[in-house]
Amino acid sequence: MLYLKEMNLEDAKVQWDFFQTWNDENGVQNHYFKMNYDEFCNSAIPKRIEFSKGINLPEGYVPDTYYFLYDSEVGENQIVGLFMIRHFLNDFLFNGSGHIGYIIHPEFRGRGYGTKGLKLAIEKLKEMSDFVEDEIFLRCLRSNEASLKVMLNNGGYLHHQD
């Protein structure tokens, strides 16, 4: 069974392990790659939890929540992807990365997790009380055909190409 779970301290080890499997890829930045585990637990996770609640946001940022995609059929604590949901957009995000960024664990790519996880992430976004836009905006690099396919599989359309 696939499910999304917010970043939290209880699952810190498997979350940290996930971040060590990939570095910046296809426009998704990994600020936690090679971060030591103690710093991840004591600083990174509490800060992400605050950001998800709109607390102590740097200027120009909007609340965003990190959701890990788990597949219980692969393993009880197996993270197969990460979906970063921005609760609403400012001008920068509207013209930039959009509402949802995501990455699938390198070991689990090509298995449909992107499509299924994005569907769950879209449902989460629509449930958020501060989501006010009429449409959900997503963006991917032109060279990232797999991500474009994931978006199209979830009812997306190509608005424009840069």
Where are these regions (language model features)?
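Short aromatic/hydrophobic contact patches that present stacked aromatics
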Residues: Y3, G101, F137-R139
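Amphipathic alpha-helical recognition patches that constitute DNA-binding helices
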Residues: V14, H99, E135-F137, A146
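GNAT-family acyltransferases
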Residues: M1-H99
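Helix N-cap/coil-helix junction residues
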Residues: Y113, D130-F131, G156
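Conserved GNAT acetyl-CoA-binding A-motif
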Residues: E127-C140
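A short, internal acetyl-CoA/4′-phosphopantetheine-binding micro-motif in the GNAT/acyltransferase core
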Residues: Y70, H87, H99-G110, L141
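Conserved acetyl-CoA-binding loop-helix of GNAT-fold acetyltransferases
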Residues: G101-I104, G110-L125, L148-N153
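Conserved active-site alpha-helix within GNAT-family acetyltransferase domains
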Residues: R142-H160
